[in-house]
């Protein structure tokens, strides 16, 4: 027998609310028992299209490192950038003049590092870094020397606890830093690190240094008449830098008298 959609006894009607309709596996419908009050206060706990209210801020913007030097000075580190990086020279930045002119100084501040490598200053924000600009110094009310001192102090503290990897193959030896923290290449700025590499590698030959990317510092001892090692070292630096997300330099350097200079010997094949 066919079902009559207008017969209430058969579960259907086209008049009023159809409470008795068979919804199968669907959830039972919800019906309003009153018209909505559009002027009523919004219920903060009521979800809207799956939206979850944002967490309540526990601090003001003025307390973030970008605005508070007392917090920033514990988080700032030096970092290398490729030669040719467009930045504002830190030695030319004048805090008093920048404060007086009111102009924006959004370009990253850069120092000249060893072998002409640019050095910027980065705020460690965890998943990313904030590169320090002149606007930051103006907001913090500090000079370039304060920034440099804090960054080197933090790098030194971190480096003192960071491990080294030592690899030996016959008479060949590599010492490298690849912690993943992001400050490995910058370790070469520290006198203690230069002393360490000189002690470990210096007695056996020339000390080759590679800074292919931000996360790697590699050093090797080049013994006399081992040109093959120099070529292999140069190839590694070239390939690593070419595939890096944050490359620094494809050149091979060496330590001479405690100074980082460009290696004038064998180049990559």
Predicted feature residues:
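Extended, low-hydrophobicity segments enriched in charged/polar residues
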Residues: 9, 16, 20, 27-169
């Amino acid at each position: 027998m066919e079902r009559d959609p207008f017969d209430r006894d058969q579960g259907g009607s086209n008049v009023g609310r159809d409470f008795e309709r068979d919804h199968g596996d669907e959830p039972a419908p919800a019906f309003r028992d009153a018209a909505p009050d559009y002027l009523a206060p919004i219920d903060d706990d009521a979800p809207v299209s799956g939206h979850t209210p944002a967490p309540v801020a526990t601090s003001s913007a003025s307390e973030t490192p970008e605005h508070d030097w007392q917090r920033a000075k514990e988080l700032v580190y030096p970092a290398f950038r490729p030669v040719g990086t467009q930045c504002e020279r830190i030695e030319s930045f004048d805090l008093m003049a920048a404060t007086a002119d009111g102009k924006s100084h959004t370009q990253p501040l850069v120092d000249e590092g060893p072998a002409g490598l640019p050095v910027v200053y980065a705020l460690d924000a965890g998943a990313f870094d904030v590169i320090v600009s002149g606007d930051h110094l103006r907001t913090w009310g500090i000079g370039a020397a304060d920034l440099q001192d804090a960054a080197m102090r933090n790098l030194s503290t971190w480096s003192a606890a960071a491990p080294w990897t030592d690899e030996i193959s016959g008479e060949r030896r590599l010492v490298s830093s690849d912690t993943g923290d992001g400050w490995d290449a910058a370790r070469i700025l520290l006198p203690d690190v230069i002393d360490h590499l000189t002690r470990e590698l210096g007695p056996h030959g020339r000390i080759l240094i590679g800074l292919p990317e931000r996360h790697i510092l590699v050093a090797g001892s080049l013994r006399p008449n081992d040109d093959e090692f120099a070529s292999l070292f140069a190839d590694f630096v070239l390939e690593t830098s070419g595939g890096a997300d944050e490359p620094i330099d494809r050149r091979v350097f060496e330590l001479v008298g405690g100074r980082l200079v460009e290696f004038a010997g064998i180049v990559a094949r």
